[in-house]
Amino acid sequence: MKLILACSVAFISSASLVLFLRRVALHVGLVDAPGGRKQHEGKIPLVGGLAMFSGFAFGVLLLAEPLTSYRSLMAAMALLVIIGTVDDLSGLSPFAKFIWQTVAALLMTSWGGVGVAQLGDLLGMGQVQLGSWAIPFTVMCVIGVINATNMSDGLDGLAGGIAM
């Protein structure tokens, strides 16, 4: 029941924040114009990531679990939201984005202990253990997911829909 409540609050607060932040973004010029791989029509406010992160954070707070287990994830997500907003406002170089994505992934893996330790039984010969490659592999996976999500954001709501 607690999980359903937390998910409901996360969804409702994210949706509400999108509506509120949309007006703010249009007012301050935090918008994306169509062109290139971006197929949307008109200027689109760039606030989906901030709204979804905030909604997720509200939901996590309602779980009443020890927040220490979420600290590294929340810090990494907050860093990515900040870097994404800075990139949307002023444009960061691909190298700078890669560095910050790596820092966020390392926050989760090194500080939070989150990682892919084994790949399962891929070859039918037993579990493939990553050992000392677990952190580098996880960092590469996280960076890959971040960039795949970013690349899918050329159509209105596609990245947000995939994330949900």
PLM regions and their residue ranges:
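"…together with the soluble PPM/PP2C metallo-phosphatase catalytic core" -> "…together
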Residues: M1-M164
